[in-house]
């Protein structure tokens, strides 16, 4: 789960990874150098007595070549190889983690769109998630200023189904959501959230869309089986302290998706969509693309030219060798089982003075009705007394 706020490619997560790599490399460099204390830094033997060993090593770079040319024992060679393997494995794991983080939605939207809601009302997540699925948004009818309330988001789907993962294998669906609040509304700070609401929120971590838009909240991807219903703790603004806010009815927009997208922001297809023929002709050959899966389809056109269409692991072929196909004809099934949906809601920022005035009005109406009843009883008694005379 992406639990850090990333507004740019070089955001806090990437910086932390860089520092982690530096510390790891420094550690292995120290271990590597300590294997040969007699030959390192011959001009400065006190370097091992201080914490300047790395700087000294860099300053004495000519001695490095004499150092590595030193005749090594077998045990020392083995230690060097193990150190290098450990560094390479660490680099690969960190790089892989960084790539997965940067490719996780809603990072795509944050990096490519200043505002997630277009002028037409469509949320930009629909540019990559092409299938339409329902989402639900539950809001209170009205809230008081400077109070914390719940916005409940439901992303329903059949939890028995599995989606195609990036490596072509099957796995569970993730869910994500973007909640566009009115200006002034924001995520409630932890010290303002009631304990009961904290239990409903669980371990979810919400992000601002960017530092300039704290009223737009995003979350995901998170496991769909656990978080197909999410509670957003929202803090309402106070017009008494923020003069840009008024006591009005405000719209709230929700976008929610389950599963992976079909198109990347650069326009390329993912392996979670249908693949079509780039040209018409006859399929003359189908070969596996790699051990991990995928296919290379060779299509021979009417003029004898052969075109190779590449299909990544994931989609299943629905054509065979010798079959005649037309341009843009589907070569695979559509493996996508997820989709994106939008939902709008409204909430009233209620003025406490209006509420107090309404209560006073109701009391006045009740008293008026009571006095009318009493006056009617008095009038009936007077009429009855006059009739007796």
Curated annotation (Swiss-Prot):
Heme binds at residues 105, 125, 128-129. Disulfide bonds: none annotated. One of its GO terms (cellular component) is chloroplast thylakoid membrane. Its cofactor is heme. Gene3D superfamilies: 2.40.50.100, Cytochrome f large domain, Single helix bin. One of its GO terms (molecular function) is electron transfer activity. InterPro entries: Cyt-f_TM, Cyt_f, Cyt_f_lg_dom, Cyt_f_lg_dom_sf, Rudment_hybrid_motif. It comes from the Eukaryota. The chain crosses the membrane at residues 355-375. It is a single-pass membrane protein. Residues 1-42 form the signal peptide. GO terms for biological process: photosynthesis. Belongs to the cytochrome f family. This is Cytochrome f. The gene is petA.
